UniProtKB/Swiss-Prot annotation:
GO biological process per UniProt: translation
Database matches in PROSITE patterns: RIBOSOMAL_S13_1, RIBOSOMAL_S13_2
SUPFAM superfamilies: S13-like H2TH domain
Region described as Disordered: spans on this chain: 93-120
PANTHER family noted in UniProt: 30S RIBOSOMAL PROTEIN S13/40S RIBOSOMAL PROTEIN S18, SMALL RIBOSOMAL SUBUNIT PROTEIN US13M
Gene Ontology MF annotations: rRNA binding; structural constituent of ribosome; tRNA binding
Subunit structure and binding partners: Part of the 30S ribosomal subunit. Forms a loose heterodimer with protein S19. Forms two bridges to the 50S subunit in the 70S ribosome.
GO cellular component terms attached to this protein's record: cytosol; small ribosomal subunit
Domain of life of the native organism: Bacteria
Name of this chain's protein: Small ribosomal subunit protein uS13
Organism: Sulfurimonas denitrificans (strain ATCC 33889 / DSM 1251) (Thiomicrospira denitrificans (strain ATCC 33889 / DSM 1251))
Function, as annotated: Located at the top of the head of the 30S subunit, it contacts several helices of the 16S rRNA. In the 70S ribosome it contacts the 23S rRNA (bridge B1a) and protein L5 of the 50S subunit (bridge B1b), connecting the 2 subunits; these bridges are implicated in subunit movement. Contacts the tRNAs in the A and P-sites.
Upper classification of the organism: Bacteria, Pseudomonadati, Campylobacterota, Epsilonproteobacteria, Campylobacterales
NCBIfam families documented for this protein: uS13_bact
Amino acid sequence: MARISGVDLPKKKRIEYGLTYVYGIGLHASRKILDATGIDYNKRVYELNEDDIAAITKEIRASHVVEGDLRKQVAMDIKALMDLGSYRGLRHRRGLPCRGQKTKTNARTRKGKRKTVGAA
């Protein structure tokens, strides 16, 4: 099993889809990485040799922010919005949607379980 950026890639998948299991790498980025390293998209993960894995790892380290570093960066960006006091930061702080959705009836995912108010 190939291990790239701390993630075990599924053996039987094609490498272009296997790389998407790494947080921060989608299909487009996966194809760019494979183009840069010269590895065929249709190759399966179990068919990769050590040189291929090393080349992919080197390319990812050189040109992509992935896994823990990316999660940390996203968290810091959200924290910066909250510290600024921007509208998006306030919505994050209150646990409400940031992108303009209505909240009168929906938004249960962001708001969490219902809290009944009133009726004595």
